[in-house]
Amino acid sequence: MDLEDIRDLAKTNQLNQLSQLIDKYIIPQELEKKTNAEVSTPYKLRQEMLDKIPTDFWTKPHTVFEPCSGKGGFVIDIIDRFMTGLTDSYPDEKQRYKIIVDQCLYFSDINPTNIFICQLLIDPYNEYKLNYNEGDTLKLDITTKWDIAGFDAIIGNPPYNEDPTNTNDPHMKPVYQNWIYKFSKISIILLFITPSKWFTSQDILLYKLRDYMKNCKIEFIIHYANDNVFKNVTIKGGVSYFLINKKFGGETTFNNIQIDLKKYDIILEPKYYKFISIIYKYFEINLSKLYCSQGTFLNSKTEKELNNNTNDILCYVSKNKGLKKYLEKNKINKDYNYWKIITPAAAYKGSSGFSNLYILNNYEIHSRSYVSFKVNNLEEAESLLSYMTCKLTHILLSIRKQTHNLCNSDVFKWIPLVPLDRKWNNIILHKYFNLNDEHIDFINTIKLDGKYI
């Protein structure tokens, strides 16, 4: 696709075709992905999102802002919706287009190249007075820039994580919450797609976002659990899009099923509401009570001092490193004189159960590749191991586990701590929780990764 192709499509208002060609030919470069967290929303997903806005919205010249315009996918789609919706009000095609790009559409991006691309797509002959901002959108003052107080709708796919070149933290902090805070305040409708980690994450930034969202008038949430919604980009925990509507007065729907956002501390998928209500009373004393973090015995320094001397303390490491290493006793600063169940700190993907489980005696420790659960003796260890291999236990973990990570005790808060005086299996566990055939059938229908029986 060259410049003349773009001009021809724009001139003849073949916007739908132009929108699809953006996905094919105008692709974010690796540096743009890394520095600006730029990820293009696929054409079909953009259409799906825009279809959720009532058709009559596009029949009036509302103001719509795309705050992270990228390569222009949403920008062109928004124009296309207005071109259809305003046909009766403005029969003349050229006049209609001018009203849309002069009065309805606003867009912004930090990348000058993206602004140039959007200008080229919208106005290849430089005929119109476009409303755009080149710079950090989070610092944009729309009153100063455009002499307006807010928008009828804000639509987009904001950056997800901070620029890695601006931090020494290997765990990049989320930033999309800042976009939600800013733009939900200055729009009647906010339609964003973001990672779904905010549903359950205990990261303080996302925990605060979850509390904020519970008090917003969210009309719907559509969640995709798969981590491959975006081409060549993996989003752990999946992605979701939501619509905040200040004029909405009903209950939120999650994947088209009504839910109560405030009922639990996390955002719970609808299919689990009835089931969780049955066993919620058992959650007060839970598996997090026994939890020991991945750094309980080793830190980055002592992990480098592991050796192959079998006379030292046995330390379980990852399979890639041979599963078993050893460490001098005087290198261990914390008490390890207890039995423990260990499991890899990274298990499969989001919404999965436990990976492999091992019993360690009171003379053995583990590396930072594992988390563990502290018990008093072999009998309790065997009991806990049997409990942790039951399918129900894996399901309860998966509900709060949005990514592969088990490094926060909060993901175990909905796994009741059962008596460790018996061997558990699925039948015994179902009876313990007084589950009926309907509940058991539900458990059997759940498909998830995990090492369970």
What are these regions (language model features)?
Residues 123, 389, 445-448:
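Short amphipathic alpha-helical surface patches that mediate protein-protein
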Residues 49, 118, 384, 443-444:
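A structural signal for short hydrophobic/aromatic patches embedded in well-ordered alpha helices
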Residues 86, 205-206, 212, 235, ...:
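Charge-rich, low-complexity amphipathic helices
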Residues 438-453:
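Short, amphipathic C-terminal "tail helix"
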Residues 67-69, 292, 319, 447:
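Generic detector of intrinsically disordered, low-complexity, polar/charged segments
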